Amino acid sequence: MPAYFQRPENALKRANEFLEVGKKQPALDVLYDVMKSKKHRTWQKIHEPIMLKYLELCVDLRKSHLAKEGLYQYKNICQQVNIKSLEDVVRAYLKLAEEKTEAAKEESQQMVLDIEDLDNIQTPESVLLSAVSGEDTQDRTDRLLLTPWVKFLWESYRQCLDLLRNNSRVERLYHDIAQQAFKFCLQYTRKAEFRKLCDNLRMHLSQIQRHHNQSTAINLNNPESQSMHLETRLVQLDSAISMELWQEAFKAVEDIHGLFSLSKKPPKPQLMANYYNKVSTVFWKSGNALFHASTLHRLYHLSREMRKNLTQDEMQRMSTRVLLATLSIPITPERTDIARLLDMDGIIVEKQRRLATLLGLQAPPTRIGLINDMVRFNVLQYVVPEVKDLYNWLEVEFNPLKLCERVTKVLNWVREQPEKEPELQQYVPQLQNNTILRLLQQVAQIYQSIEFSRLTSLVPFVDAFQLERAIVDAARHCDLQVRIDHTSRTLSFGSDLNYATREDAPIGPHLQSMPSEQIRNQLTAMSSVLAKALEVIKPAHILQEKEEQHQLAVTAYIKNSRKEHQRILARRQTIEERKERLESLNIQREKEELEQREAELQKVRKAEEERLRQEAKEREKERILQEHEQIKKKTVRERLEQIKKTELGAKAFKDIDIEDLEELDPDFIMAKQVEQLEKEKKELQERLKNQEKKIDYFERAKRLEEIPLIKSAYEEQRVKDMDLWEQQEEERITTMQLEREKALEHKNRMSRMLEDRDLFVMRLKAARQSVYEEKLKQFEERLAEERHNRLEERKRQRKEERKITYYREKEEEEQRRAEEQMLKEREERERAERAKREEELREYQERVKKLEEVERKKRQRELEIEERERRREEERRLGEDPLSRKDSRWGDRDSEGTWRKGPEADSEWRRGPPEKEWRRETRDDERPHRRDEDRLRRLGGDDEERESSLRPDDDRIPRRGLDDDRGPRRGPDEDRFSRRGTDDDRPSWRNADDDRPPRRIGDDDRGSWRHTDDDRPPRRGLDDDRPPRRGLDDERGSWRTAEEDRGPRRGMDDDRGPRRGGADDERSSWRNADDDRGPRRGMDDDRGPRRGLDDDRGPWRNAAEDRISRRGADDDRGPWRNMDDDRVPRRGDDARPGPWRPFVKPGGWREKEKAREESWGPPRESRPPEEREWDRDKEKDRDNQDREENDKDLERDRDRERDGDREDRFRRPRDEGGWRRGPAEESSSWRDSSRRDDRDRDDRRRDRDDRRDLRDLRDRRDLRDDRDRRGPPLRSEREEASSWRRTDDRKDDRTEERDPPRRVPPPTLSRERERERDREGEKEKASWRAEKDRESLRRTKNETDEDGWTTVRR
């Protein structure tokens, strides 16, 4: 829509303006823009006149497509608002089209009969015919006037029907337009358009049935809709009958019957009567007299039943028509010889069944059936007397000589009733044919031969030719046995005795049978005669006996009938079951066969599809290649043709054919083309230069010649312009003078009216002054009142605003005070928390100082122990005889002032097997180094010494040097289970009071590898206090159990320590440098050996190789944990600084598992201050208890050493040929060896305690130095120091477990510094022994039961 039409009214006004000046097309365009506009889609009252004007213009201009589009747009606009407006517009549109068509028809003389299809007016034949024959002015006028308007009217009807279809709101309008369209077709005899209209209506009906779910869909179950559709179809049927379009009429009948079937209620009797009347006409016109008569029968019965006011004349007329229609049904069957030869019986039967369905009959009617119905319902009594006897003459009586004469009277009476009974005239020919046939049948039964002239005299209403044709048809179709002899002009009947009549032969009045029938039925007649004779011959008593026998049989049957009936039923049931079983088997077999066939077919289909796909691919490839080749050749050919069209190309390729050049390279041709283009370009430039010179010279000469001409023309034009200006100036002055004179005249004339005007104005003012003053006074009063009201309103509003402002300020003040109070409380809480953190820091520093003091004292004691161990090792090395060395050591030990005597303390249960010398030396020598390594591993190391260990010039203590005088790393008597052999007689490592169940294999009663006094949870990595990775009770058993609940191996955020034992493992490994996972087997892995029980884990290299390749030559550190380290495993930090642990762990393994489960709680920051305070108190109590237990353990250790020295003198020296060689003489299991001798465990336990003491000494010394360098810990370390767990782990364990482990090696010590520490340790140990002698000794005793469990008795 144009931008200047903001309202539809403006568009309508604009269109009317165009129409006033005779411009219909612009007016139509303006209104079209309005209808297409999306801005005005809501219906308004102005839309209807706009639409009417729009349709009027479309009719005037014959723009049917624009009218259709406008109607659809208007339907969308007003369908939901005002559907009545749409109906009015459509009716007005059709009325305009009809008026225009009628006007054109009056002006034209043409009847539009010669045009078959309005959609295709000019056919090639009509154009040629008009060119050949020529047309006058009237014909051309008719073609230009009437035909286009008729076509426009037809298109209008069709468009409106399409617009209104399947819309329940305009259903009445739809049927009215359809009926108008039928009248149009009938008026203008438009047969083609009638067929199209019927097809459209049929399509609309199918769409109604298909799209019944739409909101505006038509419900065919509605009686009103059904009546409207039936009415329209009856009009269609009537129009088809009037136009003699019987095929369309029959389709209309089928449509009407379909509508009847959709209806749940029976249609109205008037409608059915009209329907039967129309259908009877259709059947008669189609030549189907049988169904025509049947339809009249239905109409007759309907009228008798439903019509209450049926008169006697109407009843008589209907009965007469029914009688004549029934008797007019051909006696001969409808099937022809061609139908018999083509075996079209099925088609005929199906057709008759369909026709019977249209009449509501269950089966197709027959002539005999209709005659019987007519007699049964007593139709003959209502027939007129003149026709009443016709039934008896044709169907009952046998009188061939008078038959035609009687029938002739009836036919004459029918012919005399054209005005009263016009519909009876159509039955006369059929009645004549039936009369001739009945005459021939009766004559054949009487005469054997008859002359043709005699027969002609018996049939007076036909000539000889028609009679002969009737005779031939009767012989062909009615099984009439007749032969015509043209020589004698006679007819002979029944001459063929072998002739057999058909079953459908017509039946009529019968006198006697034909000779052929008598011969054919001779056996049947003989049988009937013999049966009668037999009845006569048989006497009565025989019949009586038969009757008695019959009664006996009946009695026996009645007696056994129930059983027999049950037997028959059972047999029937069995048969049915067997049939069902067989059917199921057959169905199953067929199903399997079908599935198998389908599977085979599927395989074949897939193979075929694959083959076709491959072939298609290959064909596609070949096609693409061919297309490429063709495109290439085409490109080459085009280039060559382009080149040859030029002069240079023609010269270059004049001797070469294009077909030969197609084999050349396109690049070569392109190069030729480029070369040729360059030459042409040069030639063109030269020609342009020459032409430029010519044009330049020519233009210069031309301009020189035209200069004087231009000057002369300028002078002439200047003179003309001057004359014109002077003339116009004179005219202007004259015009102004005339205007001034006229103005003066007007002034003089009007000046006489000035006084009258003033007087009128004065009177008017005087008259209206009082009115003005009164209105002014009223205005001032209203103004004062309004001013007062507004002032009051303003005062009230100000009061409300002040009140609202006061309450808002008061609320803001309260909110501000609450915020200040909350801020103050938060500051107080922060201040209290800050003071609490400072108090915790101070307490932590005090606790650290106490721990350092305790460590200093313990270090002095351990130095004494180390000094004593060193002296004992030197004495052991100096002595040659093992027995003398042990005696001297025992004497030295006695001289130290020990209070225990050897013989008194030496009991059988404490004595163990003689310990081998190399094992004692190994454990004593490697104890200090392992303690240092354990302590430094736990610390993780962040001082300068640990950082320096990463450098190549590593000065750490070598783990195993070449000059190491210790024994072999591992012997067959190694005390770890994973390294034991089957003959190991050592006792278990389990603590005496350890009540934990055995860990893994068999009856293994060993505890963990840790010290007996170590009650802390096990470690894995550095200070890992996590729960065990395997089962709850399995401490480092098999590498993974079935109930393993471990998480992922290692995550990015895993803060656990390295699995190889801490940060001091700098060995070259096959793992990545950042991979902190523990070794597969070794270090702290206490799992059993993967090899056999007799395998004591010898070196995987040769026995003589002592790990020199991985350890430095000066490495005197302890042995590797994975092979020959007999230290306790690092599953708990047993050598950390601090007081000694109690010897007996309260709670056992159950308490430990409970502590581990509860260790999965929240972090330490979530604990309340009361729990942290309780932790600090508990820490102090544990420190005091550790100090007491430390003194007791040292005393117990001294006791064991004295006992061991006493037993060493009786110990046999061991052959140390191979450090991995197992004992050959020991063959018992580890359980038997533990039972045989428990004393060896005491010796090994004492050695382990000594080595652990040395490690603790070095670790605490390094920890002190490390703390001095690091200073006080941060808050995160302090908070994590006191763990929220219930176990007795130390703060160092948790702190190091929280901190991510760092791969920094521990600080190393030189050999001189190590020796100084050994001497200090010996001195501290000696002083500690003197102090320990004053304390009471806790006596222990190891008892082993039958199952191998070891109990420690105090």
From Swiss-Prot:
Sequence repeats: 924-931, 932-941, 942-951, 953-962, 963-972, 973-982, 983-992, 993-1002, 1003-1012, 1013-1022, 1023-1032, 1033-1042, 1043-1052, 1053-1062, 1064-1073, 1074-1083, 1084-1093, 1094-1103, 1104-1113, 1114-1123, 1124-1133, 1134-1143
Gene Ontology biological-process entries: formation of cytoplasmic translation initiation complex; IRES-dependent viral translational initiation; negative regulation of ERK1 and ERK2 cascade; translation reinitiation; viral translational termination-reinitiation
Residues that bear N6-acetyllysine: 68
Region (Interaction with EIF3B): 664-835
Keyword line: Acetylation, Coiled coil, Cytoplasm, Initiation factor, Phosphoprotein, Protein biosynthesis, Repeat, RNA-binding
MF term (GO), any: translation initiation factor activity
InterPro entries tied to this protein: EIF3A, eIF3a_PCI_TPR-like, PCI_dom
Stretch list, region 22 X 10 AA approximate tandem repeats of [DA]-[DE]-[ED]-R-[PLIGFSV]-[RPS]-[RW]-[RL]-[GNIHT]-[DGLPTAM]: 924-1143
Amino acid composition bias (Basic and acidic residues), ranges on this chain: 866-1136, 1148-1249, 1262-1302, 1310-1343
Bridged cysteine pairs (disulfide): none
Annotated Gene Ontology cellular component terms: cytosol; eukaryotic 43S preinitiation complex; eukaryotic 48S preinitiation complex; eukaryotic translation initiation factor 3 complex; eukaryotic translation initiation factor 3 complex, eIF3e; eukaryotic translation initiation factor 3 complex, eIF3m; microtubule; multi-eIF complex
Xref: Gene3D superfamilies: 1.25.40.860, UVR domain
Annotated positions of the Phosphoserine modification: 492, 584, 895, 949, 1038, 1159, 1233, 1310, 1336
Coiled coil residues, start to end: 82-120
Protein transport keyword on record: no
Main subcellular location of this protein, as a coarse class: cytoplasm
Domain PCI: 315-498
Region (Disordered) residue spans: 809-844, 866-1249, 1262-1354
Modifications the protein undergoes after translation, according to the UniProt entry: Phosphorylated. Phosphorylation is enhanced upon serum stimulation.
Subcellular localization: Cytoplasm
Protein family per UniProt: Belongs to the eIF-3 subunit A family.
Primary role: RNA-binding component of the eukaryotic translation initiation factor 3 (eIF-3) complex, which is required for several steps in the initiation of protein synthesis. The eIF-3 complex associates with the 40S ribosome and facilitates the recruitment of eIF-1, eIF-1A, eIF-2:GTP:methionyl-tRNAi and eIF-5 to form the 43S pre-initiation complex (43S PIC). The eIF-3 complex stimulates mRNA recruitment to the 43S PIC and scanning of the mRNA for AUG recognition.
HAMAP family for the chain: eIF3a (MF_03000)
Quaternary structure note: Component of the eukaryotic translation initiation factor 3 (eIF-3) complex, which is composed of 13 subunits: EIF3A, EIF3B, EIF3C, EIF3D, EIF3E, EIF3F, EIF3G, EIF3H, EIF3I, EIF3J, EIF3K, EIF3L and EIF3M. The eIF-3 complex appears to include 3 stable modules: module A is composed of EIF3A, EIF3B, EIF3G and EIF3I; module B is composed of EIF3F, EIF3H, and EIF3M; and module C is composed of EIF3C, EIF3D, EIF3E, EIF3L and EIF3K. EIF3C of module C binds EIF3B of module A and EIF3H of module B, thereby linking the three modules. EIF3J is a labile subunit that binds to the eIF-3 complex via EIF3B.
Name of the featured protein: Eukaryotic translation initiation factor 3 subunit A
Lineage: Eukaryota, Metazoa, Chordata, Craniata, Vertebrata
